[in-house]
Structure formats: structure tokens, C-alpha cells
Design a protein with these regions (language model features):
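One-carbon transfer enzymes
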Residues: 1-117
């Protein structure tokens, strides 16, 4: 499958950027987040599950089983698909170089802040 716009995130700010892009700019083709089980092994400040975005917008959501995107399910998913551009909001971890290399135009990250400035 070919995904043009992909958003990475695990927080309410991630939901906000998905909503903004989807409603104001262009369709979001995929959201990559972590499964709730990952939060039991990692400190995730302000975690918010994003699987509801499938129902809200019809956007597929991939839930990784590793915050570092190294689990077999996620590696296979990334290997079997093509990606154009990524937006990272509220991920709280470095995205590995092998994942960055999968995106034709790169992944662009934003740091959260108080008050959603």
C-alpha cells in the first residue's frame, strides 16, 4: 500500500495535529501509534490511544508493539508499504533511521508545548 501522509503520535497533541491536517489541509492516510500494552513497559507522559481515529475519520491506525518501532509486526508493516511524508507530534522518542529512510520526503517533527501554541 502507498501512504502519502502519515502521522506519528501517542498524545492528545497527536490527535490535534491529525484533526487539523485532515480538516484543513489534506487527508491523513495513516496514523502510527503504540499499543496500550507498550505503556506498561515505557514511561509515556500524557498517553492517549488514537485507534478511535479510524471511526472518526476512517484513517487506518497502526499500533506498534515497541515504542522504538522495532517489533516484528511494525518492521513487516514498514517493509511491505511505501510512504511519502511523515509528521511526528507527541512521539517522545527518536524515530530510528531505518524508519526515516522509508519516507520519500522525510518525517518532520514538532515538539509539544503548554496551551497548544
Amino acid at each position: 500500500m502507498h501512504y502519502k501522509v502519515v502521522v506519528f503520535g501517542v498524545k492528545d497533541t497527536s490527535e490535534n495535529i491529525v484533526s487539523f491536517i485532515q480538516e484543513e489541509i489534506c487527508p491523513v492516510d495513516l496514523v502510527i501509534t503504540i499499543s496500550p500494552e507498550v505503556t506498561k513497559k515505557n514511561q509515556v507522559s500524557g498517553y492517549k490511544g488514537l485507534s478511535f481515529l479510524t471511526e472518526k475519520y476512517g484513517i487506518p491506525v497502526h499500533e506498534a508493539d515497541s515504542y522504538f518501532l522495532t517489533d516484528d509486526k511494525t518492521r513487516k508493516f514498514l517493509a511491505e508499504n511505501e510512504f511519502e511524508i511523515g509528521v511526528c507530534m507527541g512521539w517522545q522518542r527518536l524515530i530510528p533511521s531505518d524508519v526515516l529512510d522509508k519516507f520519500e520526503y522525510g518525517i518532520y517533527g514538532f515538539h509539544g508545548n503548554a496551551g497548544y501554541l
